[in-house]
Amino acid sequence: MTDNIYIQTENNDKLKEECGVFGVYDFDGHDVASTIYYGLLALQHRGQESCGIAVSDTNGPKGKVLSSKDMGLVNEAFTPEHLEKLKGDIGVGHVRYSTAGGSTRENAQPLVLNYVKGTLGLAHNGNLINAPELRRELEYTGAIFQTTIDSEVIAYHIARERLNSKTVEEAVGRAMKKLKGAYSLIVMSPRKLIGARDPFGFHPLCIGKRDNAYFFSSESCALDTVGAEFVRDVAPGEIVTITPQGIQSDRSMASDKCARCIFEYIYFARPDSYIDGICVHSSRLTAGKILAQEHPVDA
């Protein structure tokens, strides 16, 4: 069951490039909405168009997901009263610039999908080049889309693969084999939090830990903000599953070739973040030095 209010706004198909994702699973049962809020504030530079939070209580009714999302900045969309209503010890958050689909309330994330096997929450940073093809395939088999974003295509494919998979993480892996493009995903089921990165590692995704809570984040700066320790980056092509039993890793989708987005280091990421072991600020200084050496000017 999902608590959402949708407001129709004018469509805007301008292409932009950034999004930020953040997820938490607190094994001590503490509510995570406020933590996600502060994580999203730290990732606000990655998306200022819309934002959202979805949570689930692992000790409550299975499959119940509470979500709230709106246009605008994080501190404008969420009041203390909003956060107080989002009760749950597992959750995902998202800040968005549209890469595919219009700038509307419906296209805000996280997406929450109810299907025959239960409920999924999904936050996605990236862009699929084969989204139109995958969308048509789903529509021909009866899928009805509520948004125009490729993130919903991913969610539908995960749900479909789940019908023939033993676990949600297996379904994520099977869906990834069909996806072409860039994606860093956080998938929430009622008892699991899953992070996945495309085989080329185009956009960042990292893991953090604070006491008995585990985190996924687009950037390490958000982990610092909530007092979490950086554990490691999610490897390109890796699926990381967090459950009360621990962390499981599947690298069967890993590729020998990485193709990271250079603009993460040049422009997108916050200077105090580390991406794949490289300090963003240091990378910018180094790039400037090399540029000056290769193209000196008289000044």
Predicted features and spans:
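Conserved short alpha-helical segments that host acidic/polar catalytic motifs at enzyme active sites
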Residues: M1-P236, T241-A299
